[in-house]
Amino acid sequence: AGGEEMYQIAQDMVTMLREEEGCNYVICIGHLGIDDETAVTANRSIDLLAKVTGIDVFIDGHSHSTEEEIAEKTNADRKVGDTVVTSTGTKLENIGVVTIKDSTITTECVPTEGIEIPADNEIAARAAAIAAEVEAEYGIVFAKTEVTLNGEKAPGNRTEETNLGDLITDALVWKATETGETVDAAITNGGGIRATIEAG
């Protein structure tokens, strides 16, 4: 869903949470972002919040924005209507903190640089075991390609048909036909194709 349909779904959910569930606060975790790229379709968090009331805090993603960048698109309080918008930037540079005290909501981003957390040996061992399984699986050659398969964003899978997108959807059709049903077509999200596969 997007645009007006998305706004209505969000508003219905907020109404249900407040009126039927009796929630005092509604905190929305979303992946809409504030970048100009999505402004064309009016699918940014700030577009949604201009149409939806009753959300106290919107914890955003997608555009990897900092609170300073959000303030540039909104105001010094990072508010759209009564909703505070927050986001932690990118690559775990910050840890987001939302505090609700005496009906006052504040948000902040705590930089992770310099924070040291002691390793948990049990978790480290489990993570290493999973990584070994993945590496073993990735090491198996199951196919070869004579051409480079385009996994680029633009120009590429987000802007046009590509050979890697074709391969993926052909594979989806092939697998789906194993159900015995007639399959006419398959569609894949260009945003889910993340890397080029070199010839070889």
Task: List PLM regions with ranges.
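Binuclear metal-dependent hydrolase catalytic cores centered on His/Asp/Glu-rich metal-binding motifs
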Residues: 1-25, 106-108
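Histidine/acidic-residue-rich catalytic or RNA/ligand-binding cores of hydrolases
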Residues: 68-77
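Glycine-enriched alpha-helix->loop->beta-strand junction motifs that scaffold or abut catalytic
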Residues: 53-55, 81-82
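Phosphate/diphosphate-binding loops
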Residues: 85-94, 100
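Peri-catalytic substrate-binding/gating loops that frame the active-site cleft of hydrolases
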Residues: 1-9, 33-42, 66-67
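Solvent-exposed loop/linker segments at secondary-structure transitions
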Residues: 18, 25, 36-50, 57, ...
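Active-site neighborhood of phospho(di)ester-bond hydrolases with catalytic His/Asp-centered motifs
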Residues: 26-31, 55-66, 86-88
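Residue-level detector of flexible, active-site-proximal loop/helix-junction positions
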Residues: 65, 92, 194
